[in-house]
Amino acid sequence: MHRRHFIGSAALATLLPLVGGAAAIAAPRGRLLPAALAPGDTVALVSPSSATDERLSLQLTQEAMQALGFKVKTGEHYASRYGHLAGTDAGRAGDLNAMFADRQVKAVICVRGGSGAARLLPMLDYDAIRANPKVLLGYSDITALHCAIHARTGLVTFHGPIGAGSWNRFNVDQFRRVFFDRELMQYHNTVDAGDELVPRKNRTLTITGGKARGELIGGNLAVLTALAGSPYLPDFKGKILFLEDVSEAPYRIDRMLTTLKLMGALDAIAGFIFGECTDCDPGDGYGSLTLDQIFDDHIKPLGIPAYRGAMIGHVREQFIVPVGGRVELDADAGRFRLLEPVFGQA
């Protein structure tokens, strides 16, 4: 994602050979489940990352939450701007802290991603988050929040549509099934041949066959990798790692997976799911590795169940995935399923 100006991955890999988090930060004991959601609850809209360019997008976000049956509360700075960011770091972090501390708010919905969420991680009140476990929803740059909050509190958070994104029929159905019906979800792609002889859209590819069980961690590859050497990555041991990205040339994907390899993360995981890498074609000029070759180099030698093509990432229709949820991955079938509930009491 070209607007993210991070330290180079090769330099990050030399900081700390961590599997997850710095030794000085104690890992939480067990998972922390968010309170269940219901129509009529109050949800908060916050902007932890980039500013939203158009007022209409903010209006549509509020209308979408109301159409889902919620009362809406907005962060003080959710419509602010500071450079490309939605306000200052202190203002954006303050909104997150206030909404987690507010007992009337049952979920925190991120308006958009972009960049800047990682700047907030030292300013978050993890004790307040731990004391008020609630739904956090977003993706892309919100990966920084998913990683840090899960690492520091054990809270299960949700990688899925942003408030200003598309609330199409598929995404609304996912939302209701995950949050209102609290299904033990079966995540398998919707495949439609359309006018093609054989289906092309939403196809999955097995990298290494087999089944594995573990807790899901992951999100956007660039954002997650940029946290290397910090105390804000969860432990990778025995986990099912899911990743996605957008507008990254294959050589960048290769470099970031190399970082995860060098820091010990890839050798620790039990399974691997890659979603969509939207607009990740090689550029002009020198030759390029293909994504197939990159996954064959980095993932296949691990010998763990792995597949690519899941409906996760910068796509119009996307899964709502619980970060910290316990799942079973079936790489041959290109699907995974929840094994346990991911909500506590309402």
Predicted feature locations:
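C-terminal active-site/capping subdomain that shapes the small-molecule cofactor and substrate pocket
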Residues: 252-346
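N-terminal small/polar loop signature for handling phosphorylated ligands or for N-terminal nucleophile
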Residues: 76-132
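Conserved anion/nucleotide-ligand pocket segment
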Residues: 158, 162-220
